[in-house]
Amino acid sequence: MTARVRFLLLASAAVLTLSACNRDREPAADGAVPAAPGAAVTPAEAAAPLTFSEKTAFATVSLKLPDDIKAQPDLHAKVYAQEVAHLREFAEGAQADNTEAGAPNLAYEQTVELVAAHETGKLMSLKRTAFEFTGGAHPNTVMTGVLWDKALKRQVGWAEIFTKGADFAGLDRALCAAINAAKRARVPDAEPVALGGKDWACPRAAETPFVLAPGTTGGKAGGLTFLIGPYQVGPYAEGPYEVTVPLSAFQSLLAPAYADEFAGSLAKVATTTP
């Protein structure tokens, strides 16, 4: 396996781990990523600052966390440790790639930022955006969500929020309609997408990262904002989309344990950010 392939596998694994809260969790894994021996987080770093940065001849990496995360120290420590380990693996991969090429000829870059999306009585929702450049025609941006149960002190996701075996066909259609509305708002002559499309297709809701959307009822979520990256529903030039679906599209599908975290209508009517 070449160093380039090894690096890409490491990067992909780390991204999937942080978005595990929006997927079915593996038994007993709970989103943990063991750091590589050369990428260990020191005891001092385990105190979990809000920022991290490092620059070498081969890569520049940085992390920024929101002030809100300090209220959940277990989440804070977990996210910081995972992200720092991943960024160091990225930097090591950059060095390996350039060493294999014979000389440092391209500086890689990765920046990761988490921002507070919304918070309810039980749940804290964060949006994670990772910007990455490793050469090629353009950088890559990946958005994922982190959902934290404040009482249980663990990440939760689709499998916990929704009833097992629920039929999401209606939610899939609502998400697809919202995506097309967002595409038309941004690019009036954009080609519409559909579920099962050939070139571009609407994603299934259960397979799409999300964050909680603010509602008109205090301390509750009024919907879900789905995070859709470049290339998913259109050309790269269209950019990413953050598409919000109201509670009415999925309220009957919520699991009893979290149904009371949702109420009201959306606080913001727009279906996507500018």
Feature locations, PLM:
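Bacterial N-terminal signal peptides that target proteins for export
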Residues: M1-L9
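Alpha-helical transmembrane segments
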Residues: S12-V15
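C-terminal motif of bacterial Sec signal peptides marking the signal peptidase cleavage site
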Residues: T17-A20
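Compositionally biased intrinsically disordered regions enriched in Thr/Gly
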Residues: N22-P274
